[in-house]
Amino acid sequence: MQTVQERNDAVMPDKTPKKVYEPLQEKPVYDFFKRIFDLVVASAALVVLSPLFLVTAIAIRAEGRGPVIFSQVRLTKNAKPFKMFKFRSMCVDAEAKKKELQDQNEMQGPVFKIADDPRITKVGRFIRKTSIDELPQLVNILMGDMTVIGPRPPLPDEVAQYDEYQMHRLDVKTGLACYHECLGRSDSDSFDAWVEQDLKYIRERGMLTDIKVLLMMVKAVLSGRGAV
C-alpha cells in the first residue's frame, strides 16, 4: 500500500532541474602542447623569480619558528593525491586551529575560508595578497602533478563532500591559476559559482584559452585583486 507521500510524489514528480555535464572531450594534441607550455613557463618562472624565493624564505624564517615550505596532500586529475607545496603563510599549528574556526566559515559548500583568518601571519598576509605563497607550486608543475592553468587542487576532505556534478572539476589536471580566481572572484561565497567557472574552462580549454587566463592571472596578481 502506498503512503500519502508516495501518492503525492507520483502525482507531482520532482521538477527540480538536474545539472547535466557534457562528457569530457579528449584533446591529445592540446594536452601535448600544454605540457610543453607548462615546462617552459614553470622553468622560466623559477629562474626569474629565484631571488624572490630567497627573500620570501628569509622573511618567513625571521618572523618566527616553523618551516619555510608548507606541504599538504591535495587531489589532482581523477582524484589522484599528491603533495602540494606553498610558502608557509600561517602559524605552525594552523591545521589544529581550523576546527575551532569552522563555525566562522564564510564559504558555501565544502571549502573553508574566512576573510580575517587569525592563523595567518604578518608575512603570510602579504605573500597571500600577492600570491607569492603559491610560487613553490611551480615545482609541482615540473613534477607533473599540476599544470599552470586549471581548477585549483582541493583537499581530500573537501572532495569527500562533492556531489557527482562537482566531481567533474577533477576531470583534468589541477592548476596554479584557475579561471574563477583570475576573474577576481576568489573571495566569492558561492562554491557552485566556482564549480561552474571551472567546468566552463574545462569545456573551452585550449592553448589560446590558457594564454588568456595566464595573462589574466598576471593582471590579477599585480593589481592585488582575486589573488591566486
Q: Where do the language-model regions lie?
A:
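Alpha-helical packing segments of well-folded alpha/beta enzyme cores
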Residues: 36, 134-135
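A hydrophobic, helix-centered structural microdomain
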Residues: 23-96, 207-228
